[in-house]
Amino acid sequence: MRINPTTSGSAVSALEEKNLGRIAQIIGPVLDVVFPPGKMPNIYNALVVKGRDTVGQQINVTCEVQQLLGNNRVRAVAMSATDGLTRGMEVIDTGAPLSVPVGGATLGRIFNVLGEPVDNLGPVDTRTTSPIHRSAPAFIQLDTKLSIFETGIKVVDLLAPYRRGGKIGLFGGAGVGKTVLIMELINNIAKAHGGVSVFGGVGERTREGNDLYMEMKESGVINEKNIAESKVALVYGQMNEPPGARMRVGLTALTMAEYFRDVNEQDVLLFIDNIFRFVQAGSEVSALLGRMPSAVGYQPTLSTEMGSLQERITSTKEGSITSIQAVYVPADDLTDPAPATTFAHLDATTVLSRGLAAKGIYPAVDPLGSTSTMLQPRIVGEEHYEIAQRVKQTLQRYKELQDIIAILGLDELSEEDRLTVARARKIERFLSQPFFVAEVFTGSPGKYVGLAETIRGFQLILSGELDGLPEQAFYLVGNIDEATAKAMNLEGEKK
């Protein structure tokens, strides 16, 4: 990554030759600015509005140029609230896109979309900044190695394994556990993972951001006593932020992750919660920018915007970015343009099901709806592949039999089908697992289950060795030995 050195002399002369414009129109978060002829800023340049409002309060609003309208006008989207701005106010063209601090000094800190620290710990100790708009790495730089990323979550590791250096999507409607699953993945992976992580909070609840920060301090991922030893940088643009901030905060987080990958040559984890809010923010400003709405009211540039973000999240020969993204599914409709566009970019999808959440099976991951390009015998091995397929077949058969059971009852099934149903119900319960981050709600200590243990457990259920155990023994346990111990306890309680 090239960082152009600037001497103090040229910086002074650049300030003297400031390109000034004036606000001509304000429509919510969108501003029209008039510049002198021949002095038009480039698209994506940052503009700064400084001044005082009618009450004398200081105003400092950064905007990003989106369109050149002709007649010496540009249209820009504000990154913070436009309250107090008036027509005729002076606007400064910075002559460059938004740039944010990057490098080791960002670890342990919380930033907003502009790269300004918001954690009251003082300024960031770095001179190195990077623009948030960059092109994706060239095809020849990409790394194509295939390896599994173990998460310690049974349902994920067995049925839809994650790729190291890949892109993973967690799909689900409101309240089915996307953020809890992301927090568990941060807990299991970021703690064990030697490299660094970047968390981009895009348009989600402020409370969740605060909880995550507190939890990271408790677990030592953020080291309060020595911030430099922290392992994560946090970038937040919450629900209450204007759409401009929510639209760009994902790029700010990605820029920080890219620096660790390209310059420090590290393996980076990038968590984004929630990628749908990035699309939603784009659709909010799209109409104000004069674009005709497309399907379901989304912006016509949906695929382009998503592609420009996702194509930068990749692994190169220098280092890797493994990205885990939560994707809100409006009205539980996976064919909605926002989740449907996201699907195309992912190596693995973890689909959360409201039906399983209603049954109390957590994580509520749909074992039949979740997919992964990694579930191939040449990558995961014959044994893993075969057991995953048999688990899916058993669950699929159970799903087909549910209508018959509902109408005629279990007794009308053949002996073979009854056995399939009994094993499927055990598998369904064994796919649940107590989470470390949910200990407060469940009262059960969290469990990390290695891949070998997971495969052994499902092998035993499918082989019929555990047919005599009650199905409730398999609910919310870690490995299979805990299930057999729980069955003995249940037996003892009955006596």
Curated annotation (Swiss-Prot):
Protein EC: 7.1.2.2
Membrane topology listed for this record: Peripheral membrane protein
Molecular-function GO term, any one: ATP hydrolysis activity
Name of this protein: ATP synthase subunit beta, chloroplastic
Subunit structure comment from the entry: F-type ATPases have 2 components, CF(1) - the catalytic core - and CF(0) - the membrane proton channel. CF(1) has five subunits: alpha(3), beta(3), gamma(1), delta(1), epsilon(1). CF(0) has four main subunits: a(1), b(1), b'(1) and c(9-12).
Protein family according to the UniProt entry: Belongs to the ATPase alpha/beta chains family.
Family matches, as Gene3D superfamilies: 2.40.10.170, Bovine Mitochondrial F1-atpase, Atp Synthase Beta Chain, Chain D, domain 3, P-loop containing nucleotide triphosphate hydrolases
Cited InterPro entries: AAA+_ATPase, ATP-synt_VA_C, ATP_synth_F1_bsu, ATPase_a/bsu_AS, ATPase_alpha/beta_chains, ATPase_F1/V1/A1_a/bsu_N, ATPase_F1/V1/A1_a/bsu_N_sf, ATPase_F1/V1/A1_a/bsu_nucl-bd
Keyword ATP-binding: yes
Keywords: ATP synthesis, ATP-binding, CF(1), Chloroplast, Hydrogen ion transport, Ion transport, Membrane, Nucleotide-binding, Plastid, Thylakoid, Translocase, Transport
UniProt-listed GO biological process terms: proton motive force-driven mitochondrial ATP synthesis
Gene symbol of the encoding locus: atpB
Swiss-Prot/TrEMBL catalytic activity: ATP + H2O + 4 H(+)(in) = ADP + phosphate + 5 H(+)(out)
Class of enzymatic activity (EC top level): translocase
Binding site for ATP: 172-179
Presence of keyword Iron-sulfur: no
